[in-house]
Amino acid sequence: MNTPHLLSSLSRSQLQDRLFGDGLDLLIPPFAVRVQSRIDVVAEGLACLYADYQIPPFRGTGFSDFHVSLLSCRRWFRPLCAFQLDGVQPFTPLALSEAFALFEWGLNWCVTSHCHQWVTLHAAVLERDGRAVILPAPPGSGKSTLCAALMFRGWRLLSDELTLLEPESGLVMPCPRPVSLKNISIDVIRERAPDCTIGPLAHDTQKGTVA
């Protein structure tokens, strides 16, 4: 049986080689995702924020729930990035600098659009002492900021963006991924948790500055 390795075990050139080629297989429980991209900020974001996530020891050795690509469009004038799932482009392309943010947003869309075995809530969820607290809120209300702050106060992150509930048991299916912070929230968390890891910033997005 193959033992998974961590993404951090890959050098930057090895990471790019996989992203440029058949794709990087990344285990983001409960999902397996294959990512392809030649955009530098995608490799940078994955190396920074997914370093402790598992990858199969050999390329192409596992099943992937989602095959996603981040492709550059318009090479010279205001270059853009497009998100694709299985070769289908569900969104309008965004600025190339937003490519890693688009990966995160696109992955959220993959889950909400295709994983109907759970009740999916737009809510952060954390655990402490075997109990989960669910934080439902509209975008821009500070949900992710509160979620990140609680993480540094002894709470365990189960999900920042989507709460997946088992319909029969009512239990939460953990799907921990990097917390998405915007604008002043980035500095708030940096001040409260100086040792936290902040990924590449995307400026001038529709949501402002996103990390």
Region annotations inferred by a language model:
Residues 2-48, 62-63, 124-138, 152-211:
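Glycine-rich, often acidic-flanked micro-motifs
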Residues 8-18, 58, 68-74, 114-117:
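Short linear motifs in intrinsically disordered
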Residues 53-59:
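Active-site phosphate-binding and catalytic loops of NTP-dependent enzymes
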Residues 61-112:
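Charged, amphipathic alpha-helical linker segments immediately N-terminal to NTP-binding catalytic cores
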Residues 86-87, 117, 169-170:
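Detector for glycine-centered tight turns/loop "hinges" at secondary-structure junctions
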Residues 141-143:
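Conserved glycine(s) of the Walker
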Residues 146-147:
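Post-Walker A alpha-helix
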